[in-house]
């Protein structure tokens, strides 16, 4: 059994999509996407927040290797991480919205708690 979801894409496209989803999620605090993408994004975003809570230079560089925008990394370390200083994991929440009109895929909202 695989440790991650393939999301029907080649590796490079999947990584690029997840980087963009995580960056958008941390930038806006919530995103609307399909359920499987949200679950995969949630996993990575929680790791990024945990790294940001550490707050040192190495953690910042590790986050920068994945998140595509410097401003988002700044926001993550200065606003988001301090907010969750006392919380051990579980920084995100997934709400089901319903099926998407075009193809019936289950759409959810992924947001910060």
Swiss-Prot record:
Keyword Transferase, does the record have it? no
In terms of Pfam families, this protein maps to: Ribosomal_L17
What are the GO cellular component annotations? cytosolic large ribosomal subunit
Keyword Ribosomal protein in record: yes
Question: What are the entry keywords?
Answer: Ribonucleoprotein, Ribosomal protein
**MF GO annotations:** structural constituent of ribosome
Instruction: State the source organism's domain of life.
Output: Bacteria
GO BP of this protein: translation
InterPro entries for the chain:
Ribosomal_bL17 (IPR000456), Ribosomal_bL17_CS (IPR047859), Ribosomal_bL17_sf (IPR036373)
Sequence similarity: Belongs to the bacterial ribosomal protein bL17 family.
Describe its partners and assembly state: Part of the 50S ribosomal subunit. Contacts protein L32.
Matches recorded under PANTHER family: LARGE RIBOSOMAL SUBUNIT PROTEIN BL17M, RIBOSOMAL PROTEIN L17
Q: Which HAMAP family match?
A: Ribosomal_bL17
Output the NCBIfam families linked to this UniProt entry: L17
Q: What is this protein called?
A: Large ribosomal subunit protein bL17
Q: Which organism is it from?
A: Clostridium botulinum (strain Loch Maree / Type A3)
């Amino acid at each position: 059994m695989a440790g991650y979801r393939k999301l029907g894409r080649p590796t490079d496209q999947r990584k690029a999509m997840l980087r963009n989803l995580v960056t958008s999620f941390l930038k806006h605090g919530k995103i609307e996407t399909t359920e499987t993408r949200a679950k995969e994004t949630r996993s990575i975003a929680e790791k990024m927040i945990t790294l940001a809570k550490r707050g040192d230079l190495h953690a910042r560089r590790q986050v920068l290797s994945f998140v595509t925008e410097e401003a988002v990394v700044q926001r993550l370390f200065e606003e988001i991480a301090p907010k969750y200083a006392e919380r051990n994991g579980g920084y995100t929440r997934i709400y089901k919205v319903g099926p998407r009109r075009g193809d019936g895929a289950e759409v959810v909202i992924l947001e910060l708690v």
